[in-house]
């Protein structure tokens, strides 16, 4: 169980193709034996990401919900999070002992953020293939997320991106806030993300409670 009232809600945002759904999949598979988990995804007109998680076997289908935001996906996680809050409430009613709810935003830009009503912790995912200037551009996702994930570091030599520059810029833009460089395809850096969620979110595994 969590160390606070209700399940820990972790919001995962980032541009289209950065690796949000891949991270959701890996987190579910890595944590489901130790914690009671549910996953919620956001898409504009489909439930593609939720269906992917079901096909991948991330969790059982009843623990995965897809929210069709219709229109701007940013609004559904910030200004009017009612659909996502309702999805969280439904999961809590089905699974009263939930420890963790992972909430993936629709593909968004650097200005998108999660409402504090919806997410207790926020993780923002960018990827190297978009260029090494991304961390320096700032925006709430870069500067204010609880954890910044710089994914697809294996592509750096192929796209002419400097990981050193991204490291320097991320430190400059984020100050004391942590970031991690990853290659989620090979699960490189995943352990650091897991450790961050457990420590920052105050999670206590089922094994520890037994």
From Swiss-Prot:
Main subcellular location: cytoplasm
Pfam families reported in the protein's UniProt record: cobW
Domain of life: Bacteria
Gene3D superfamilies cross-referenced by the UniProt entry: P-loop containing nucleotide triphosphate hydrolases (3.40.50.300)
Cell compartment(s), UniProt: Cytoplasm
GO molecular function: GTP binding; GTPase activity; nickel cation binding
Binding residues for GTP: 14-21
Key words, A-Z: Chaperone, Cytoplasm, GTP-binding, Nickel insertion, Nucleotide-binding
GO cellular component terms attached to this protein's record: cytoplasm
Single GO BP term: urea catabolic process
Function: Facilitates the functional incorporation of the urease nickel metallocenter. This process requires GTP hydrolysis, probably effectuated by UreG.
Annotated family: Belongs to the SIMIBI class G3E GTPase family. UreG subfamily.
NCBIfam families for this protein: ureG
Subunit-level organization: Homodimer. UreD, UreF and UreG form a complex that acts as a GTP-hydrolysis-dependent molecular chaperone, activating the urease apoprotein by helping to assemble the nickel containing metallocenter of UreC. The UreE protein probably delivers the nickel.
Protein name, entry field: Urease accessory protein UreG
Protein encoded by which gene: ureG
């Amino acid at each position: 169980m969590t160390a606070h009232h209700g399940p820990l809600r972790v919001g995962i945002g980032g541009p289209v193709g950065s690796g949000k759904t891949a991270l959701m999949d890996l987190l579910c598979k890595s944590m489901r034996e130790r914690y009671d988990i549910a996953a919620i995804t956001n898409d504009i007109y489909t439930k593609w990401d939720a269906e992917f998680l079901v096909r991948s076997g991330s969790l059982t289908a009843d623990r995965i919900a897809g929210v069709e935001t219709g229109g701007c996906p940013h609004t559904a996680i910030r200004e009017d999070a009612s659909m996502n809050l309702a999805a969280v409430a439904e999961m809590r009613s089905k699974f009263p002992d939930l420890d963790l709810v992972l909430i993936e935003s629709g593909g968004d830009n650097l200005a998108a953020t999660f409402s504090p009503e919806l997410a207790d912790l926020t993780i923002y995912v960018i990827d190297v293939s978009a260029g090494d200037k991304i961390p320096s551009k700032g925006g709430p996702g870069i500067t204010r997320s609880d954890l910044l994930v710089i994914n697809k570091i294996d592509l750096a030599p192929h796209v002419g991106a400097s990981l050193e520059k991204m490291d320097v810029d991320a430190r400059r833009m984020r100050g004391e806030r942590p970031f991690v460089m990853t290659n989620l395809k090979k699960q490189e850096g995943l352990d650091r993300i897991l450790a961050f969620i457990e420590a920052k979110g105050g999670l206590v595994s089922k094994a520890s409670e037994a």
